[in-house]
């Protein structure tokens, strides 16, 4: 019975600790939406580059990445 108050206090302390989501974001964190924009831009540039008449499509000079 001596351990019961200690156990209750520990459970209350564990329940009151802040979760991982409660911590503030640093200024250098970049939201994932900005990365999606970069992917779309790269896809658009690749489409433009491949659609121009630079050489035979089988040649590597017509493809990016």
Curated annotation (Swiss-Prot):
Protein name per Swiss-Prot or TrEMBL: Conotoxin TsMRCL-05
Signal peptide: 1-22
Keywords attached to this entry: Amidation, Disulfide bond, Neurotoxin, Secreted, Signal, Toxin
Maturation and modification: Contains 2 disulfide bonds that can be either 'C1-C3, C2-C4' or 'C1-C4, C2-C3', since these disulfide connectivities have been observed for conotoxins with cysteine framework V (for examples, see AC P0DQQ7 and AC P81755).
Record propeptide residues: 23-52
Pfam families referenced in this protein's UniProt entry, alphabetically: Chi-conotoxin
UniProt main location, coarse: secreted
Family of the protein in this entry: Belongs to the conotoxin T superfamily.
Subcellular location: Secreted
Organism: Conus tessulatus (Tessellate cone)
CC terms in the record's Gene Ontology section: extracellular region
Known tissue expression: Expressed by the venom duct.
Modified residues (Isoleucine amide): 64
């Amino acid at each position: 019975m001596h351990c019961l108050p200690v156990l209750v206090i520990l459970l209350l302390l564990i329940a009151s600790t802040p979760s991982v989501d409660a911590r503030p974001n640093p200024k250098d964190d970049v939201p994932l939406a900005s990365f999606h924009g970069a992917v779309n831009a790269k896809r658009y540039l690749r489409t433009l580059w491949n659609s121009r008449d630079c050489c035979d499509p089988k040649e590597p000079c017509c493809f990016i990445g």
